[in-house]
Curated annotation (Swiss-Prot):
GO terms for molecular function: rRNA binding; structural constituent of ribosome. The lineage of its organism: Eukaryota, Viridiplantae, Streptophyta, Embryophyta, Tracheophyta. It comes from Picea abies. CDD domains: KH-II_30S_S3. This is Small ribosomal subunit protein uS3c. PANTHER family: 30S/40S RIBOSOMAL PROTEIN S3, SMALL RIBOSOMAL SUBUNIT PROTEIN US3C.
């Protein structure tokens, strides 16, 4: 039986880097780790809540967090940064996000710095493609059509290969199954292959569907 492993952890230190950069004493490690997860969740929820229209989606590729003694630095890599600009009020949207994160952390003695980095080719990032697929599935667009369209979007961004897998009660069928599609080559067993990956669950009227995307960036 095949032994499954996370493609990002499999390549950590070779083609993938850590998303959090900090050191902590043993007694504080679990607390800081939970804080990182809360920060990422808060940012994702904020972007979903403050998008301009129902046809848009967050477009967050990844969130990197680094810590110093009294400073938390957060860098958000996003495909569509204008979604954070609320009603033309400039960067007040980012300031509101900063205040929301600080209130969630319930800390007054630490500083928080948030930077936005635009992703040049957003559809080369599996997280952004997964959000797009999830939005289409929520609208009951056929899953095969959605996968074909997602592969086309990725190939326009000149990726070497992409593989998409969707599992669950597809098209409302009573028996859950797994369907997948691929464009180009995706060498999952090659450690030096620069493969990006994400898993994204989506709630539909038929239940939860799991979306997995592998993208070869070379």
């Amino acid at each position: 039986m095949a032994q499954k492993i996370n493609p990002l952890g499999f390549r950590l230190g070779v083609t993938q880097n850590d998303r959090s950069h900090w050191f902590a004493q043993q007694r504080n490690y679990s607390k800081d780790l939970r804080e990182d997860q809360k920060i990422r969740t808060c940012i994702e929820n904020y972007v979903r809540t403050h998008i301009k229209s129902s046809s848009n989606y967050g477009g967050i590729a990844r969130v990197e967090i680094s810590r110093k003694i009294d400073l938390i630095q957060v860098k958000i890599y996003i495909g569509f940064p204008n979604l954070l600009l609320i009603e033309g009020r400039g960067f007040q949207g980012i300031e509101k996000l900063k205040n929301d994160v600080l209130n969630m952390l319930d800390s007054v003695d630490r500083k928080l710095h948030i930077a936005i980095e635009k992703v040049a080719k957003p559809y080369r990032k599996p997280n952004i493609l997964a959000e797009y697929i999830a939005l289409q599935l929520e609208k009951r667009v056929p899953f095969r059509k959605t996968m074909k369209k997602a592969i086309e979007l990725a190939e326009r961004e000149e990726v070497e290969g992409i593989q998409i897998q969707i599992a669950g009660r597809l098209d409302g069928k009573e028996i859950a199954r797994v369907e997948w599609d691929r464009g180009g080559r995706v060498p999952l067993q090659t450690i030096r292959a620069r493969i990006d990956y994400c898993y994204y669950p989506v709630q539909t009227i038929y239940g939860v569907l799991g979306i997995k995307i592998w993208i070869l960036e070379e």
